[in-house]
C-alpha cells in the first residue's frame, strides 16, 4: 500500500451526477474521494474503472436520480444562472 497526502478541495459537479456518485460510493463501501481517485487513475491509464456488475448498478442509480447525461455531454454543459 502506498502512503499519500490528500488535499481537501471544493469542486462543483452536476447535481444528479453527484447523487449517483455518492450512492455508488455507498454501495461500494468507500468514500466519494476514494471512488473519484479510482475513476481518475483508471482514466489516466485508459482503463475502464468498472466491470459489468458495477455498470449495471450505475444504470439503476442513474434511473433513480434522473441522470441522462452521457460522455457526449462532457465539456458541453452550461450552468443555469
Regions found by a protein language model. Give the residues of each.
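Extended hydrophobic secondary-structure segments
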Residues: 13-18, 33-36
Amino acid at each position: 500500500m502506498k502512503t499519500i497526502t490528500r488535499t481537501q478541495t471544493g469542486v462543483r459537479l452536476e447535481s444528479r451526477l453527484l447523487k449517483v456518485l455518492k450512492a455508488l460510493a455507498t454501495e461500494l463501501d468507500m468514500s466519494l474521494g476514494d471512488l473519484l481517485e479510482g475513476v481518475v487513475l483508471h482514466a489516466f491509464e485508459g482503463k475502464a474503472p468498472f466491470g459489468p456488475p458495477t455498470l449495471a448498478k450505475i444504470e439503476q442509480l442513474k434511473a433513480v436520480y434522473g441522470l441522462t447525461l452521457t460522455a457526449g455531454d462532457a465539456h458541453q454543459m452550461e450552468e443555469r444562472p
